[in-house]
A protein has these predicted regions:
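Cleavable N-terminal export/targeting peptides
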Residues: 1-25
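Outer-membrane beta-barrel proteins
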Residues: 16-19, 36, 60-62, 95-102, ...
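Short glycine/proline- and aromatic-enriched beta-strand/turn motifs that initiate or cap beta-hairpins
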Residues: 20-74, 96, 114-116
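Repeated loop/turn-to-beta-strand initiation elements of outer-membrane beta-barrel proteins
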Residues: 26-28, 63-68, 102-106, 149-159
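Outer-membrane beta-barrel translocator domains and adjoining extracellular loop/strand segments
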Residues: 38-47, 76-84, 118-131, 169-175
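Residues that define the transmembrane beta-barrel architecture of outer-membrane proteins
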Residues: 48-52, 84-90, 137-143, 171-175
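Residues on the lipid-exposed face of transmembrane beta-strands in outer-membrane beta-barrel proteins
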Residues: 54-58, 92-98, 110, 145-149, ...
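Predominantly the C-terminal beta-signal and adjacent terminal strand-loop region
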Residues: 75-76, 139, 143, 148-183
């Protein structure tokens, strides 16, 4: 139901928007992203994983774009009894922009993300020792907001917050900064 409403909103937006001067066309880019993993089941602090994300997409006009992303984690983080490592991630997204000036474009973004990671926990509960080593896939609808700033006609930078996964007692989000090049 939510997906159908989202697709309808995108179609209406695409049909109502006119072309503009903002580097319409294909682009590629890369971001440094600090992924944040929260797991309420283990009552641990937020785990932070450094990662690199590659982006490629197409800006139809000033207001509408689509992009795909793929990335991988560089390391793992441990706090208390929990350890998390992100192996890889990929997804597809629709981006809606609202230009403030010729070079400043805040946006919202939504789509679907798949990730593979490993969650490890080791501890003791009521005198019983336990150990969890779970390599698993995370997939969910994703959304976020950010700002693109054009530095030149073909080079831009961006800052973004994204919620990639939020189910049950687990959440994966990310704050990123990066560069992109239009061609």
């Amino acid at each position: 139901m939510l997906t159908r409403k989202f697709a309808t909103a995108v179609a209406v937006t695409f049909s109502l928007t006119a072309g503009g001067a903002y580097a319409a066309g294909p682009f590629i880019g890369g971001n440094y992203t600090q992924m944040q993993y929260d797991n309420e089941e283990y009552d641990s602090d937020t785990l932070k994983i450094d990662s690199a994300v590659f982006r490629a997409g197409y800006e139809f006009n000033d207001y509408l774009g689509m992009e795909i992303r793929g990335g991988m984690g560089f390391d793992e983080d441990s706090r208390g009894i929990v350890d998390f490592e992100m192996d890889n991630m990929y997804g597809a997204y629709v981006k809606l922009s609202a230009p403030l000036a010729e070079s400043v474009h805040p946006y919202i973004i939504g789509g679907y993300t798949k990730m593979k990671g490993t969650v490890k926990a080791e501890g003791s509960l009521a005198g019983v020792n336990y150990q969890v080593d779970d390599s698993r896939r995370f997939e969910d609808q994703s959304y976020g907001a950010g700002i693109d700033v054009n530095l030149t006609d073909t080079l831009g930078m961006n800052l973004e917050y994204m919620r990639y996964f939020d189910k049950d007692e687990e959440e994966i989000s990310g704050i990123s900064v990066g560069l992109r090049s239009a061609f």
